[in-house]
């Protein structure tokens, strides 16, 4: 890394444009190539390839690598981490391709087996909508549905107009609402197989830095009313096994920034 790499990384943790100032102390230890956040050492390791790292040098045995690079989404690519000494498992923070299990916390973590070495934690959209879809399908049955995501812009987009391999995403993220695709409908089926082929989806990237929204338009097998559905979702949010994933609000005054830092999906 560059000479001031550690200082810059520590500074990014210390001050965040969305979440504010880090609550605690951060100290850089250049000798150990790490920084210490509230007494917890964060080691920064540099390598040209994942298999080149020897994690055992840092006291790590049977470690879990969390891959959020976006470079690989298939088992062959992600398994390169497993070739490194000291690594036992790999978790991908995006929808996995091929036969990688997509796991949404609170929904299908029971599908994880001891022999699984590479799994996916699915996408942010999948984690947001799957708990609600499961609750609705269990109670009413879902015939068909459409998912419309209104998504905060991401680092994949451009600050100003520039080339991008995807349609429209080359246009300035802070200045435009950008129509784009989402793989959420297909990703849902990897977690809830009973909904395969029943959902469609698309997305709009909007000029906000955090908090996204998913609008579900569902055709239910069993009829209900808006009041009954809202009360059902409220009960799910308060008393079900998915209460950590689903939060409920019926306030007509809330806006997106009110949900910054929410621990719900």
Model-derived features: positions:
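Short, solvent-exposed amphipathic alpha-helical segments in soluble enzyme
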Residues: 82-84, 135-138, 232-237
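A short, aliphatic-rich alpha-helical micro-motif
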Residues: 57-59
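C-terminal substrate-binding/catalytic lobe of Rossmann-fold NAD(P)-dependent oxidoreductases
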Residues: 1-55, 144, 149-265
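Conserved acidic residues
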Residues: 61-63, 88
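Active-site phosphate/pyrophosphate- and oxyanion-stabilizing loops and adjacent acidic/basic residues
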Residues: 79, 134, 186-189
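Rossmann-like dinucleotide-binding core of oxidoreductases
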Residues: 96-171
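Short glycine-/small-residue-rich Rossmann-like dinucleotide-binding loops
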Residues: 46-49, 69-70, 95, 123
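Rossmann-fold NAD(P)-binding glycine/threonine-rich loop
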Residues: 69-117
């Amino acid at each position: 890394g560059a000479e001031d790499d550690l200082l810059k990384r520590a500074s990014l943790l210390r001050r965040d444009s969305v979440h504010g100032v880090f609550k605690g102390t951060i100290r850089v230890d250049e000798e150990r190539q790490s920084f210490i956040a509230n007494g917890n050492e964060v080691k920064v390791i540099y390598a040209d390839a994942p298999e080149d790292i020897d994690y055992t040098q840092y006291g790590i045995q049977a470690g879990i690598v969390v891959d959020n690079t976006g470079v690989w989404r298939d088992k062959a690519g992600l398994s390169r981490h497993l070739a490194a000494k000291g690594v036992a498992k790999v978790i991908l923070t995006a929808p996995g391709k091929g036969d990688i299990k997509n796991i949404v916390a609170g929904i299908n973590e029971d599908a994880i087996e001891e022999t699984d070495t590479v799994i996916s934690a699915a996408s942010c959209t999948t984690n947001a909508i799957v708990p609600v879809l499961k609750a609705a399908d269990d109670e009413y049955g879902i015939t068909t549905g459409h998912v419309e995501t209104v998504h905060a812009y991401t680092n994949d987009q451009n600050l100003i107009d520039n080339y991008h391999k995807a349609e429209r995403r080359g246009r300035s993220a802070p200045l435009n609402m950008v129509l784009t695709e989402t793989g959420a409908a297909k990703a849902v089926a990897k977690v809830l197989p009973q909904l395969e082929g029943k959902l469609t989806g698309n997305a709009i990237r909007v000029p906000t830095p955090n908090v996204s929204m998913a609008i579900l338009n569902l055709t239910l097998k069993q009829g209900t009313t808006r009041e009954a559905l809202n009360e059902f979702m409220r009960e799910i949010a308060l008393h079900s096994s998915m209460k950590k994933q689903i939060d409920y609000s019926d306030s007509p005054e809330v806006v997106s920034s009110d949900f910054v830092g929410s621990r719900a999906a």
